[in-house]
């Protein structure tokens, strides 16, 4: 008979419903994007934070709330820091969404309990919610799939080179322009301190935003203007669809306006800056975008390296121009064999030349 292992309750957190309700507007704005995301309880074991991760194409969305935990359970049995991650949508084919329940209406208490077997990481999660009618409750138990490793936030460890705060009107204008050029895949984003402008470039098309340059973010007190805290001129390339989505996610009326941060290593981050300075100090909403190479340029360079002699030059040579065909390189021979339409064209030209040569008459004068 196989040995059985007893499941032990290891750790639990209780949330502040009032804090969750304050963030309902933000959650409703991003809920479609975080449905398939990951929830993470992280930070100090005695006062962890709630974070939601999700993939946005070639970007990573992060929604974090501090000071949202009202109590913890079995804190003395845990290490100093905790980090447990689980999927937002419960596995098993059901439609239970943890975020939908946590940010729901009339929630009186909300707790998450994590358990495991001896010597193993967290394997099970139990959610319990009680509502204000003092009658209704929700209980849900699920497994935590192994190997869920959310994106490690190492971006904040690097220095910020420049910041640009956009007004809602400018952000909407840039979104529309990016959607019109989404077929080009990548967009170049550059900020220039001398000209005090933000420049977005897609091939031959350019969009320029004039900035009010300031020395500190605290001076960006008018959300209807475009501000810039530019320490260095910097440029990077990102995915055009991801940038458009990031601007829309970080633009929440009355709450956030989008702010573009330029980090070292060509990392771009779009975050939500509070409309009222000093508010939402325990909340962060950001989308991290990484440098995307220009695929068209890379493909052209690869083709140039592979074909040192242009294949088209081998195919367009006219046999009438030369009496003796030169020896072709291996690249040209391969190209002419693979491109079958060129062979009938060559035979047709030779046939026309033969016909012309037959019509030539040589006159002989015996008197000379």
From Swiss-Prot:
Comp. bias (Polar residues): 325-339
Superkingdom in the source lineage: Viruses
Chain segments carrying region Disordered: 318-343
UniProt-recorded name of the protein: Gene 59 protein
Species annotation: Saimiriine herpesvirus 2 (strain 11) (SaHV-2)
Organism phylogeny: Viruses, Duplodnaviria, Heunggongvirae, Peploviricota, Herviviricetes
């Amino acid at each position: 008979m196989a040995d059985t292992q007893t499941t032990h309750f290891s750790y639990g957190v209780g949330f502040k419903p009032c804090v969750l309700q304050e963030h309902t507007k933000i959650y409703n704005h991003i809920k479609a994007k975080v449905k398939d995301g990951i929830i993470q309880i992280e930070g100090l074991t005695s006062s962890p934070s709630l974070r939601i991760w999700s993939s946005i194409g070639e970007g990573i969305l992060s929604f974090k709330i501090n000071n949202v935990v009202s109590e913890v359970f079995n804190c003395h049995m845990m290490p100093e820091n905790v980090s447990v991650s689980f999927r937002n949508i419960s596995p098993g084919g059901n439609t239970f969404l943890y975020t939908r329940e946590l940010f729901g209406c009339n929630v009186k208490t909300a707790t998450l309990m994590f358990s495991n077997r001896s010597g193993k990481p967290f394997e099970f999660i139990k959610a319990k919610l009680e509502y204000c009618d003092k009658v209704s409750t929700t209980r849900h138990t699920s497994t935590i799939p192994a190997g869920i490793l959310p994106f490690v936030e190492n971006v904040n460890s690097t220095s910020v080179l420049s910041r640009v705060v956009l007004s809602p009107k400018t952000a909407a204008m840039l979104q529309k322009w990016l959607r019109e050029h989404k077929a080009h895949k990548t967009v170049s984003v550059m900020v220039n301190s001398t000209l005090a402008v933000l420049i977005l470039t897609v091939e031959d098309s350019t969009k320029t935003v004039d900035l009010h340059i300031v020395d500190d973010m605290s001076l960006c007190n008018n959300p209807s203007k475009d501000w810039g805290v530019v320490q260095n001129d910097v440029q990077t390339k990102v995915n055009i669809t991801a940038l458009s989505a990031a601007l829309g996610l970080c633009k929440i009326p009355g709450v956030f306006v989008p702010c573009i941060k330029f980090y070292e290593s060509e990392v771009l981050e779009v975050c939500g800056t509070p409309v009222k300075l000093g508010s939402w100090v325990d909340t962060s909403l950001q989308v991290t975008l990484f440098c995307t190479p220009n695929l068209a340029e890379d493909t052209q360079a690869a083709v140039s390296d592979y074909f040192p002699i242009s294949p088209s030059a081998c195919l367009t040579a006219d046999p009438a121009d030369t009496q003796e065909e030169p020896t072709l390189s291996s690249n040209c021979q391969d190209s002419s064999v693979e491109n079958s339409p060129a062979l009938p064209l060559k035979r047709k030209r030779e046939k026309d030349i033969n016909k012309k040569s037959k019509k030539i008459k040589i006159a002989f004068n015996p008197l000379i």
